[in-house]
């Protein structure tokens, strides 16, 4: 399922133009790396979510298909599809190993799904969202959040609980997306306001609260929330995006990784307040243009980060220099401090990996 056109454009602006709650040791934490693998015949895997039992949800892919997967007990298994196509994508996992995401029908409409006890169930609310839906988060009470496409352009956040789906509405604009939910049932995401600006929201006890943004920011988005209600995401600052923490009613600008001037976003926070995310470095001029020759650039690239001692630290500096992997993003951190990441291999294959503290 695709973002609504207007929401996607605004989020592209936030990303491209785009402290710590707990005390941390002054010594940088280093990590061991585990490749979560892919299904037989596939050479690509993408990470989605990680629980504190060491289970991870993701997607295994090749040139023509992608299948949602569950990594558990050292093995990766297919969790299948809803049957119409060979495309399914996991987005989140809870502490019981239940996985949510979306699948596609033969008519190319996305349907939210729940995978539980070895079975994938279609939870698409067709009456609310006839144009498609995607599940993005699940808590340990089996409450599921996501968004549905209500027409040709606009998405609305939803909550699925007890077999019933509720449209959560917006902050006054046309669009909203629910991206995460904690065990207290608090939901976070982002929505357009009546003026068309993207703002982070917190939905709790039937009410959507606008979390606003710090003074000088151009917008905000909330991507994750922990058990104590701390929220992470991004804010638009001075033509870039910065990773951000919202706690106790206050936004904290976490900045970006040194040199990553194209921006950063915080994607995960555990119950200890440890934060991870992704930052983007600009292209670098290698050879200036000269008569008969074009300028050469090192392409823009992304890295995963963890916040240590108040700074965003490139995770590539915290693993073995001969690992054979380049970490391109971190998508979540569990309560053991294990970090789920995306990475590329020496052969440029995308892989889901887990970093375990040494």
Question: Which stretches of residues belong to each language-model region?
Answer:
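Residue-level hotspots at or immediately adjacent to binding/recognition sites across diverse folds
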Residues: 4, 9-11, 24-358
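Bacterial N-terminal signal peptides
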Residues: 12-22
């Amino acid at each position: 399922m695709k973002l609504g056109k207007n929401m996607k454009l605004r989020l592209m602006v936030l990303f491209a133009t785009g402290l710590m709650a707990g005390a941390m040791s002054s010594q940088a934490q280093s990590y061991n790396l585990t490749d979560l693998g892919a299904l037989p015949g596939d050479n690509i895997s993408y990470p989605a979510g990680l629980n504190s039992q060491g289970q991870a949800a993701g997607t295994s892919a090749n040139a023509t298909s992608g299948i949602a997967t569950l990594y558990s007990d050292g093995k990766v298994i297919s969790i299948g599809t809803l049957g119409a196509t060979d495309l399914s994508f996991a987005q989140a996992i809870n502490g019981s190993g239940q996985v949510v995401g979306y699948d596609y029908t033969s008519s190319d409409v996305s349907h939210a799904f729940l995978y539980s006890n070895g079975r994938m169930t279609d939870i698409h609310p067709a009456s609310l969202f006839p144009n498609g839906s995607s599940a993005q988060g699940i808590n340990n009470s089996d409450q599921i959040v996501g968004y549905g496409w209500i027409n040709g352009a606009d998405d609305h956040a939803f909550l699925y609980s007890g077999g019933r789906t509720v449209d959560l509405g917006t902050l006054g604009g046309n669009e909203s997306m629910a991206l995460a939910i904690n065990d207290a049932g608090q939901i976070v995401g982002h929505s357009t306001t009546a003026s068309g600006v993207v703002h982070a929201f917190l939905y709790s006890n039937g009410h959507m609260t606008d979390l606003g943004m710090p003074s000088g920011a151009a917008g905000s988005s909330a991507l994750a929330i922990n058990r104590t209600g701390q929220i992470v995401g991004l804010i638009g600052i001075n033509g870039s995006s910065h990773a951000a923490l919202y706690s106790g009613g206050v936004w904290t600008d976490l900045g970006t990784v040194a040199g990553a001037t194209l921006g950063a976003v915080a994607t995960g926070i555990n119950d200890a307040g440890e934060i991870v995310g992704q930052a983007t470095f600009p292209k670098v001029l290698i050879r200036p243009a000269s008569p008969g020759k074009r300028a050469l650039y090192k392409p823009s690239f992304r890295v995963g980060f963890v916040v240590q001692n108040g700074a965003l630290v490139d995770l590539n500096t915290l693993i073995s220099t001969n690992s054979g992997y380049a970490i391109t993003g971190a998508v979540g951190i569990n309560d053991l401090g294990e970090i789920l990441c995306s990475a590329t291999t020496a052969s440029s294959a995308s892989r889901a990996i887990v970093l375990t503290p040494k």
